[in-house]
Swiss-Prot record:
Full protein name: Small ribosomal subunit protein uS10m
SMART domains found in the cross-reference section: Ribosomal_S10
Organism name: Reclinomonas americana
Gene: RPS10
InterPro entries with a match to the protein in the record: Ribosomal_uS10, Ribosomal_uS10_dom, Ribosomal_uS10_dom_sf
Matches recorded under SUPFAM superfamilies: Ribosomal protein S10
Entry annotated with the keyword RNA-binding: no
Entry keyword annotation includes Ribosomal protein: yes
Protein's GO biological process: translation
Domain of life: Eukaryota
C-alpha cells in the first residue's frame, strides 16, 4: 500500500494569508523532482451574513448587516513513483511552519497492489 495523491484544502478568512501560504508551498516544491503539483485551485467563497438591530428597544426598520467571507483553495500533490516517502517528506517541511489564521485539511489517497 502506498500513497498516490495528497490533497491540501486551505481555508482562511484573510485572502492575503491564503495567498502567502500557497506561494510558500509552491516555492518548496522545487526541492523534490518526483512530485507533480496541481493548483492552487480556487474554490467558491462562502459568505455568511448576519443582521442585527441597531437599537435594542425600537426602530425595527433600522438594521445593520455584517458578513464573514471564507476563502478556500486546494492544492493536489501526486507522486510519480511508488515511493511514499516523497509526499511524507514534503509534508514534514511544513510541520514546524506556523500559518496563523489558516485551516489546513490533508487528505491522503492510497493505492494497494493486488497480486493474483
Amino acid at each position: 500500500m502506498f500513497i498516490t495523491k495528497c490533497s491540501l484544502h486551505l481555508k482562511s478568512f484573510d485572502l492575503d494569508v491564503l495567498k502567502d501560504s500557497c506561494a510558500l508551498i509552491l516555492k518548496n516544491k522545487i526541492n523534490l523532482q518526483n512530485l507533480k503539483l496541481t493548483g492552487p485551485i480556487n474554490l467558491p467563497t462562502k459568505i455568511k451574513k448576519i443582521t442585527v438591530l441597531r437599537s435594542p428597544h425600537i426602530d425595527k426598520k433600522s438594521r445593520e448587516q455584517f458578513e464573514i467571507r471564507t476563502y478556500t483553495k486546494t492544492i493536489q500533490i501526486e507522486s510519480l513513483t511508488k515511493n511514499t516517502n516523497d509526499i511524507i517528506n514534503f509534508m514534514k517541511q511544513f510541520e514546524n511552519s506556523f500559518f496563523f489564521g489558516l485551516n489546513i485539511k490533508v487528505v491522503f489517497t492510497y493505492k494497494k497492489d493486488v497480486l493474483l
